[in-house]
Amino acid sequence: RFLSSKTRPDDIAVIIGNADYKKQGKDIPNVTPAYADAGGIKEYVKQALGIAEENIIFLKDATQKDMISTFGTGTNHKGRLFRYLVPGKSRVFVYYAGHGAPGEGDSNYLVPTDAEASLIDLNGYPIKTLYKNLSKLPAKSVTGGLEACFSGASEAGSVINNASPVYLK
């Protein structure tokens, strides 16, 4: 239970819990705690931040299409999130639990549940696009949290077979 906050009718949250990568028949391991983590964050934003249920975009197992329609593309930032907010008034909270993956060069991606590991540069959602589009929102503030590893490895195995993961001992 969290301390209650007054209701903030203009504030918005996007919460994504990507856990079930196997249902798409892809070669990416599941992220077991992602649903529970996203559910806990949803309760937090409702109780502690005062965000109304109808102002929460809650996505379980978001596909590339879901992420694009929510956050926009590299050339159009006016996705679903943009349309929810009240310019200059809305505070935006974004949370993602799921896989992250390295791409070519210095690029990193959120991994949609329908992604193919060998094609992550084509079907991942670029972190640079996420940050760029969030920075273009006419919001009062934007707060984000990414619960994802970008090493290319997970407890259940390699996310990206050709990646060279970094391990801490």
Predicted regions mapped to residue ranges:
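Functional beta-strand-loop-alpha-helix junction segments that form "active/interaction loops"
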Residues: 1, 35-38, 42-90
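Disordered regulatory segments flanking catalytic cores
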Residues: 1-22, 139, 159
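Caspase-like (clan CD) cysteine peptidase catalytic core
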Residues: 10, 68-159
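Hydrophobic/aromatic beta-strand patches that form the interior of the parallel beta-sheet core
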Residues: 14-16, 57, 143-145
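Cofactor-binding loop segments of dinucleotide-utilizing enzymes, especially the Rossmann-like FAD-
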Residues: 16-18, 61, 97, 147
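Terminal peptide-recognition signature
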Residues: 17, 41, 94
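Glycine- and acidic-residue-enriched helix-capping/strand-helix junction motifs
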Residues: 22-39, 43, 120
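Short, intrinsically disordered, charge-balanced linker/junction segments flanking boundaries
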Residues: 163-169
